[in-house]
Amino acid sequence: MKLIIFTGLVLFAIVSLIEAEEESGRGCILLYGECTKATGSCCSNLICDCYRKLKKGVQIARQCFCSEKDVIYKKDI
């Protein structure tokens, strides 16, 4: 019985360590990648630009994308 409990605890510890390594080893978000839920996760040469989606003047959504620093996008009509 003690062996089963010990084995279970060891397996739990190993799985926890593997998950922690995966989370800490994640790379940054690349150019034009979505950063809505993680605004600080863009690569070092990029910034997270956010845009409000409006319908009849009311905000219905917010979307963020990693874009180049010092670059301005304008709507072409």
UniProtKB/Swiss-Prot annotation:
Keywords: Disulfide bond, Secreted, Signal, Toxin. One of its GO terms (cellular component) is extracellular region. Expressed by the venom gland. Contains 4 disulfide bonds. Residues 21-26 form a propeptide. One of its GO terms (molecular function) is toxin activity. The keyword Signal applies. It holds the Pfam family Toxin_35. It is found in: Secreted. Its main location: secreted. Residues 1-20 form the signal peptide. InterPro entries: Spider_toxin_CSTX_knottin (IPR019553). Belongs to the neurotoxin 19 (CSTX) family. 10 (U11-Lctx) subfamily. This is U11-lycotoxin-Ls1b. It comes from Lycosa singoriensis.
